[in-house]
């Protein structure tokens, strides 16, 4: 079972979002998919998963942890206006 912990949390008032860096420890498991990570992070932060955008998941070969760069928007319309189209597609928001 992967363990999620918040490394950094930063409020970005300009874009009406909160930015997170989350460390996922997944010993002897694969790196979590975007959808798996989105479910767990939305549950952990108690937010609507449609307002959660995962920008990237960074893993290094052989290490049992990954870093997830995530953003939680106050309004989904802001996310659709600000985020790149490919990021929205990867998060099933387009």
Curated annotation (Swiss-Prot):
Judging by the UniProt lineage, the source's domain of life is Archaea
Q: Which UniProt keywords apply?
A: Ribonucleoprotein, Ribosomal protein
Q: Which GO terms describe its biological process?
A: translation
Matching entries from InterPro entries are given as: Nucleotide-bd_a/b_plait_sf (IPR012677), Ribosomal_eS24 (IPR001976), Ribosomal_eS24_CS (IPR018098), Ribosomal_uL23/eL15/eS24_sf (IPR012678)
Q: What's one Pfam family here?
A: Ribosomal_S24e
Q: Molecular function (GO) terms listed?
A: structural constituent of ribosome
Q: Which GO terms describe its cellular component?
A: ribonucleoprotein complex; ribosome
Q: Which HAMAP family does this chain map to?
A: Ribosomal_eS24
Q: What is this protein called?
A: Small ribosomal subunit protein eS24
Q: Which organism is it from?
A: Nanoarchaeum equitans (strain Kin4-M)
């Amino acid at each position: 079972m992967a363990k999620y912990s918040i490394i950094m949390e930063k409020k970005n008032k300009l874009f009406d979002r909160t930015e997170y860096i989350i460390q996922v420890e997944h010993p002897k498991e694969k790196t979590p998919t975007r959808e798996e990570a989105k479910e767990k992070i939305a549950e952990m932060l108690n937010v609507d998963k449609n307002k959660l955008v995962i920008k990237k998941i960074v893993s290094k070969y052989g290490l049992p942890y990954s870093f997830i760069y995530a953003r939680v928007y106050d309004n989904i319309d802001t996310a659709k206006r600000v985020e790149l189209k490919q990021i929205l597609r990867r998060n099933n928001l387009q």
